[in-house]
């Protein structure tokens, strides 16, 4: 019998792509730099690659934040200070909370039946601030943010850290998330039932097998 839910934040509950787009646009405006959609495409490509490197243990979070914007700006051939851009981007991303469709409703539903815990590889300050701004914090029984846990998803150590403070067994918890690697692969390897939120209509690598797949958050109500 399920008693608790682990649920990812970015691109599962909060639309990170839209939040990042707005934060990048505002940051570029602050620095007097031109901005267009193709520039954001470059940011997404670089950012995703760096987060995959983090998940695989190739770089630390501090390294990611130090090189992210210098890498993006170099790829765009834009002359600006990457460290200052990172600081400005974080200023905006910490406050912007654009939600995924039906996120509020699914949190209301899940929290009425289970203990719900947020899981994330982003920074604690950023995620707590954004969840509060979205008025989502009231639905959670706790937060497992890698910065506090000490390890990143999808590592075994991350999930060990989660369960160390919980009265639940692995078979009593379901993991929900959009990332095939961080959320689903990590959850499956740990022995959790998983629900892959595939809102982009992507295909999965053959070695990643979620128990359930949904394309809209409302579909979770038919599973849990």
Language-model features: where?
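Asp-based, Mg2+/Mn2+-dependent phosphohydrolase catalytic module
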Residues: 1-5, 18, 80, 108, ...
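N-terminal helical cap/lid subdomain that shapes the substrate entry/recognition surface
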Residues: 2-101
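Alpha-helical structural context
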Residues: 30-31, 75-76, 113, 165, ...
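Short, conserved clusters of charged catalytic residues that mark active-site
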Residues: 101-102, 157
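Catalytic-core regions built around general acid/base machinery
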Residues: 102-113
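A generic structural motif
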Residues: 113-115, 192
């Amino acid at each position: 019998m399920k008693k608790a839910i682990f649920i990812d934040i970015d691109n599962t509950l909060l639309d990170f792509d839209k939040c990042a787009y707005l934060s990048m646009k505002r940051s570029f405006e602050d620095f007097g730099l031109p901005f267009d959609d193709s520039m954001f495409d470059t940011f997404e490509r670089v950012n995703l690659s760096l987060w995959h490197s983090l998940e695989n243990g190739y770089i630390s979070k501090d390294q990611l934040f130090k090189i992210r914007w210098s890498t993006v700006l170099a790829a765009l051939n834009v002359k600006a200070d990457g460290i200052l851009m990172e600081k400005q981007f974080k200023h905006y991303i910490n406050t912007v909370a654009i939600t995924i469709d039906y996120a509020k409703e699914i949190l209301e539903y899940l929290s009425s039946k289970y203990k719900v815990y947020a899981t994330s590889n982003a920074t604690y300050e950023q995620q707590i601030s954004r969840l509060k701004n979205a008025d989502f914090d009231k639905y959670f029984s706790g937060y497992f943010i890698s910065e506090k846990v000490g390890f990143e998803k999808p590592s075994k150590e991350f999930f060990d850290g989660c369960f160390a403070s919980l009265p639940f067994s692995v078979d009593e918890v379901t993991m929900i998330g959009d990332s095939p690697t961080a959320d689903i692969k990590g959850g499956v390897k740990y022995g959790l039932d998983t629900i892959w939120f595939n809102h982009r209509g992507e295909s999965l690598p053959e070695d990643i097998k979620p128990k359930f797949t949904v394309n809209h958050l409302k579909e979770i109500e038919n599973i849990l």
